[in-house]
Swiss-Prot record:
Protein name: Glutamyl-tRNA reductase
EC annotation from Swiss-Prot or TrEMBL: 1.2.1.70
UniProt binding sites for substrate: 49-52, 109, 114-116, 120
Gene (UniProt): hemA
Pathway: Porphyrin-containing compound metabolism; protoporphyrin-IX biosynthesis; 5-aminolevulinate from L-glutamyl-tRNA(Glu): step 1/2; Porphyrin-containing compound metabolism; chlorophyll biosynthesis
Species: Nostoc sp. (strain PCC 7120 / SAG 25.82 / UTEX 2576)
């Protein structure tokens, strides 16, 4: 068995490609069911965020498993495989392990060191277990990655003052608008990203904020978290009326299709009315055709790179101490993985010797006859078990402790050959 990850991110694909491959949470169950139905995929976990879509698998035949994931992504995105391949990356075992550790720690994020990704990895683990995609190997891997991410947050300085996608969007808005306090700001959506938007907007001096959401209760709940600020809440049917009165609009909803386009804006905006749209959703909430309107500017997550780059160098130095810490967690996983490789050989050897012990004990007891008491049988039973355990102890300890991968595999192959063991599918 091998671990592999097939995916794409802000580093390999623009937002117009990423949004086609995005797997919203309500689709996770069916996606996992489809992936695990393929013959070569034993375990699967799906990490889908605004900046990445990564599918982690455990496969007996890695090449076949990767092909099956690629085919799934092609069908899901309706992009031909040859177009998709130029945006995909594939990482195998050690590299895949290193990658999920770096992702959980925020070291692979657009915003280096951002903390929201850790919660997203945790949710991936939870959903993978809930929908029977994650079993022994990915369960251990994701637990180790979550431990790594938590340690990086608590034991290094990279999380101190870390920016996020939301804060970078507000930073960009401040650069473009110059005076946030004078702007009427509307936020579409009331989730975690929207909460962070409000947090950063009020810290930058914004005083005229409206939240538009499908559920009034959710919008009011968010507004109450900032009760010292006069935040207005509106339902979705009021969206265009509210936008018509706004200078800045931030979109952060789970909609899978654009909720704003040129036609909708043309109906409510005055001729040449200025409006700036900051879309931090993937799939995008704002259609690209809005840029055809005079004085309307639309920005998406890919436009945040310039803002993020400003503090990248200082955070890169902090990341170096985090990388050293990750090495410890990777080693811990590798030790567990090495011990797992030996399980089937050890189990098969113990099972074979136990079968021989039981057969020979039964022959001996039958020869001794019925006058041989139960107490004597128990003594002989314990004696034979003790002999078996003593004989197996040292080989098993040495096999588990062997650090050299090739040497350990040679030992296992030798045991399998000498004892004619049938161990089934081995880890590789």
């Amino acid at each position: 068995m091998n671990i592999a990850v097939v995916g794409l991110s802000h580093k390999t694909a623009p937002v117009e490609i990423r949004e086609k491959l995005s797997i919203p949470e309500p689709q996770t169950e069916s996606a996992i069911a489809q992936l695990t139905s393929y013959p070569h995929i034993d375990e699967v976990a799906i990490l889908s965020t605004c900046n990445r879509l990564e599918i982690y698998i455990v496969a007996g035949e890695t090449d076949h498993g990767i092909r099956e994931v690629t085919q799934f992504l092609s069908e899901h995105s309706k992009l031909p495989v040859h177009s998709l391949r130029q945006h995909l990356f594939v990482l195998l075992h050690e590299d895949a392990v290193m990658h999920i550790m770096r992702v959980a720690a925020g070291l692979d994020s657009l915003v280096l060191g951002e903390g929201q990704i850790l919660a997203q990895v945790k949710n991936t683990h939870k959903l993978g277990q809930q929908y029977n995609g994650i079993k022994t190997i990915l369960n251990r891997l994701f637990k180790q990655a979550l431990t790594a991410g938590k340690r990086v947050r608590t034991e290094t300085s990279i999380g101190t003052g870390a920016v996020s996608i939301s804060s970078a969007a507000v930073e960009l808005a401040q650069i473009k608008a110059e005076n946030l306090a004078a702007c009427r700001v509307t936020i579409l959506g009331a989730g975690k990203m929207s909460r962070l938007l409000v947090q950063h907007l009020v810290s930058k001096g914004a005083t005229q904020i409206s939240i538009v959401n499908r559920s009034r209760e959710r919008a009011q709940e968010l507004a109450k978290q900032f009760s010292e600020h006069p935040i207005r809440t509106h339902l979705l049917p009021e969206m265009m009326t509210v936008i018509a009165e706004s200078h800045l609009v931030f979109t952060s909803t789970s909609a899978t299709e654009p909720i704003l386009d040129r036609a909708k804006l043309e109906m409510v905006l005055a001729p040449n009315q200025p409006l700036m749209l900051f879309d931090i959703s993937v799939p995008r909430n704002v259609h690209t055709d809005v840029n055809e309107l005079v004085n309307v500017q639309a920005f998406n997550v890919d436009d945040l790179k310039a803002v993020v780059a400003q503090n990248y160098e200082s955070r890169r130095k902090m990341a170096q101490e985090a990388e050293r810490l990750l090495e410890e967690e990777i080693e811990a996983f590798d030790i567990w993985w090495r011990s797992l490789e030996t399980v089937s050989t050890i189990s098969s050897l113990r099972s074979k010797i136990e079968t021989i012990r039981e057969q020979e004990l039964e022959k001996a007891l039958s020869r001794l006859g019925s006058e041989f008491g139960d107490k004597h049988q128990e003594v002989i039973e314990a004696l034979t078990r003790g002999i078996v355990n003593k004989i197996l102890h040292d080989p098993m300890v040495q096999l588990r402790a062997q650090q050299d991968v090739e040497a350990r595999r040679r030992c296992m192959q030798t045991l399998q050959m000498l004892f004619n063991l049938d161990v089934g599918e081995q880890f590789s």
